[in-house]
Amino acid sequence: MTTQLNINLVIENAKRVITPLSPISIFAARNPWEGLEADTFEDVAKWLRDVRDVDIFPNKALIESAVARGELDESVFNQLVTDMLLEHHYNIPQHYINLYIDNIKTLKDVPASYMNHSNVDVVADLLLEKSKRDMAESYHHYDVRPMSDAIIDEQGEPLSEQVNRQMIKWTKLYIDQFLSSWTMPKREQSFYHAWLHLAQHDHSFTKAQRQVIKDLPNDPKMTIESVLNHFSIAQEDYQAYVEGHLLALPGWAGMLYYRSQQHHFEQHLLTDYLAIRLVVEQLLVGDEFKSVTKDCESRSENWFKQTVASWCYYSDMPSDVLLQHDVNEIQTFIHFAATMNKNVFKNLWLIAWEMTYESQVKQKIKAGHESLAGALDVNQVNVTENDNANQSHSVSLNDTQAVDENNSELNQVDTSTKAQIAFCIDVRSEPFRRHIEAAGPFETIGIAGFFGLPIQKDAVDEQFKHDSLPVMVPPAYRIKEFADRYDMNVYRQQQQTMSSMFYTFKLMKNNVMPSLLLPELSGPFLSLSTIVNTIMPRKSRASLQKIKQKWLKKPETKLTIDREFDRTSDLPVGFTEQEQIDFALQALKLMDLTEAFAPFVVLAGHASHSHNNPHHASLECGACGGASSGFNAKLLAMICNRPNVRQGLKQAGVYIPETTVFAAAEHHTSTDTLAWVYVPDTLSALALDAYESLNDVMPMISEHANRERLDKLPTIGRVNHPVEEAQRFASDWSEVRPEWGLAKNASFIIGRRQLTKGIDLEGRTFLHNYDWRKDKDGTLLNTIISGPVLVAQWINLQYYASTVAPHFYGSGNKATQTVTSGVGVMQGNASDLMYGLSWQSVMAADRTMYHSPIRLLVVIQAPDYVVARLLANNEHFARKASNHWLRLMSVNEEGRFKSWI
């Protein structure tokens, strides 16, 4: 039992190196380093480079591109270098330091000739003996790597590649439940037991190896310990050894990690995977592991050679000149080279890039207002701050009605604004919001796209239920969509007819004899479809939509807003009346919309439309787990229109005028249109006028927004008809880049709309409304930081990782991807499950960057004490900031910016 508990703990701790990977159909952005954020970004970068040869700093080409485009100010970088040198004193002639810095900052590689020079070997040997003990300790972690990594096979590749191929084969077979007609036998027992059953008959193993498999224990944990003991791995090194195996195929391991979280019967899936992988490694390595020695000394030697060569090359000191110095001087030179290595300068370039962007954001905000303090309405607020942040802070208003919790009806109607439209914080909404506000008396608001509703949706036109909230939060309620019984019966029959046609086609395609006949039967139709879709993508798509609407028209539906008893549901169905009031109140507070309501309030989720795109979910709402957020918008709008909810809100201090009507829509990000999801049958005269006004200007808004967006796509020149061109991109099945998605995302601004209104933030900023004056205890800010900001940071780091290390964290070229097992994509027919973004999602061309890989800048509009209180109360966020996984800046009421590093 003690051993099993130990193995469980080892695996639980080792999971930190991978991230749960959801199926591609419900793709949700994940921070690949979430489990490693207890360490600094720089330490994780060094560790990944050491153990997997993965560099997560922007490379030389990306840095040069940023400088050329004006995104990176070299003077900022030079100042960082100067500051770094002033922190240390080196007893080295200044001209050598200057030469070294001038050369290494270009990030040039050291030529191989320097490494191979005999004098470099002499210097390395000279230093090695004195430092051998220290270096052996430093390089100990290198030796806790999979045995198969250290053994080279006859083809000249590590034996771990053979292990990987075996694991890809078996993992694909286990996971595939949708594409194959036959699934893995005995998979219901467990992955490990199904593999034991089949592997005994797998002739890719020798007869002796198959006998070993047959004799394995039934308990995967016992198998894991047996293999670790066989390889003489010390118990304190178990975790590092297991981490090495998880990082070998982080995509497949991440998919199993995700499934282990979703289903109780698969909770030990990673244990099964590791047991199988370790057995396969043992079988393939055989007795060769005995020849694998702990080569700390050779690694130390190699490190010294690299460092000596770096000093000689960057300082322009020939190795024979270096040898003329005494040992102590040589040690000083090499210590300097080790301290000032190339990755230190890569990190400085990254910081300079981020500081340049931070400065540009400041300038945009300042330039957007003649007086920032005036734009922030500071005359309305008199803030008394005590030096002790723990003491109370009072807020007094010149107009006391502005935040009076017992608001009267008089101050609730905004007669100057026709409509208020609340958009998801998604960066793609920023340009759209800007164009809407420029088109008329419309106000826009930013809030996370799930609108604070922790729900699982059960829509009539979707095969599976979907958790419509951020992936790090489990749903607490289920909301069902339903319609009139007769209409539903007709719709279900139509669905079954369509499903049976597709099922029959799939059945014929996946079976031997019928598949021979299928080309003859389907060839003419599919050929015609191919031609039409290729030549006229927009028209063919529109025609298909018309046919679908005619033959499979979704009936008018309602939602189970009120609590219902459903014994088949594992979640409560619907809300109680008090829960409806609470969620409505919370959402309105998060939108900073508790007074001055316009006659027409639109809650706008967002969705993306593309054709033949396995990654379509990556373009959907990240706050809704990779799905459109119109469902959540409709639900909240319906709740806010209920008289009993409004009465409850009034008792809580929020009065919504009777003339104010809530509606729901979806912002289609691939075409920049606004599609109505829910508009009440009865509108007040003012609401109707606002509704019609918004519809009247929407074509112009779409044209302007599409033109701005299409100008950024690399394959488009001047566009005369931007709306039609955007529709073509969304319909073209050959288009690898229907839209840029969230590429170039760089900042998250939390504050009142006046702070950024009218400012062109280039579609790079998440915008969330917030007024610190109405958040006395910091609860709202903490909610925004813990939810929307966390989602945005995950999105940001996934784009970052897919750009700086596409071979490890990206998903490669879309043109060569293969959808596998119904869960993800591979490159070719046997690779790791590619869990990041495709090359086309972050690059404009093979050598032209589009996404700028910088860490998220979070800007909070609030006094310093509010931010300090947040950092004190939210350790998780404070750790992200202090360990450099994001950058934090604040702006106070006087317009003073402060960086929190």
Swiss-Prot record:
Pfam families from the UniProt entry: DabA
UniProt-annotated location(s): Cell membrane
Signal peptide location: none
Topology with respect to the bilayer: Peripheral membrane protein
GO MF entry, a single one: zinc ion binding
CC terms in the record's Gene Ontology section: plasma membrane
Positions with a binding annotation for Zn(2+): 424, 426, 606, 621
InterPro entries hit by this protein: DabA
Cofactor or coenzyme needed: Zn(2+)
Swiss-Prot/TrEMBL keywords: Cell membrane, Membrane, Metal-binding, Transport, Zinc
Matches recorded under HAMAP family: DabA (MF_01871)
Family: Belongs to the inorganic carbon transporter (TC 9.A.2) DabA family.
Known partners and oligomeric status: Forms a complex with DabB.
Function of the molecule: Part of an energy-coupled inorganic carbon pump.
Name listed for the protein in its UniProt record: Probable inorganic carbon transporter subunit DabA
